Design a protein with these regions (language model features):
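Conserved ABC ATPase "signature" region
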Residues: 70, 105-108, 112-130
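Conserved ABC transporter NBD signature motif
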Residues: 62-70
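Helix-to-loop junction immediately C-terminal to a conserved catalytic motif
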Residues: 54
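The feature captures the beta-strand-to-loop junction immediately N-terminal to the Walker
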Residues: 39-41
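Short coil-to-helix segment of the ABC ATPase nucleotide-binding domain corresponding to the Q-loop/switch region
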Residues: 94-101
Length: 130
């Protein structure tokens, strides 16, 4: 994938809370077309890193670029980033389909495209039919 454009670049990112480094020197490039999963044990900094990507936290050191743009001055609602919370549903009163479609609807994605993309995503993880 290295011949594809970098859509996310994390360079020497550190996030400290007092004397504790929740994230310590992360370097990562994600290229267009890649599928990426962030896995690790509890307390290793996964959620902190995701919160920085989404704009809810800021790096103590280093930089995060999305599509080549430094994110430090981009508010969360203007970032092309979605975050899945550590719960089975963002909104428990909504169906699985509605939860998956939520971000696309907020982004005003055309209804037919929402339906297709949600169905594809659910099929990918064997949840089609929900």
């Amino acid at each position: 994938m290295a011949n594809q454009p970098v859509i996310l670049q994390i360079k020497q990112v550190v996030k400290s809370f007092g004397n504790v480094h929740a994230v310590n020197g992360v370097n990562l490039n994600i290229y267009e077309g890649e599928f990426f999963a962030l896995l690790g044990p509890s307390g290793c900094g996964k959620t902190t890193l995701l919160r920085m990507l989404a704009g809810f936290e800021f790096p103590s050191e280093g930089s995060i670029k999305i599509d080549g743009k430094e994110t430090r001055d981009i508010p969360p609602n203007q970032r092309p980033v979605n975050m899945v919370f550590q719960s089975y549903a963002v909104f428990p009163h909504m169906t699985v389909f509605e939860n998956v479609a939520y971000g696309l609807k907020v982004a005003k994605t055309p209804r037919a495209e929402v339906r297709e993309r949600v169905q594809d995503a659910l099929a990918l993880v064997k949840l089609d039919g929900y």
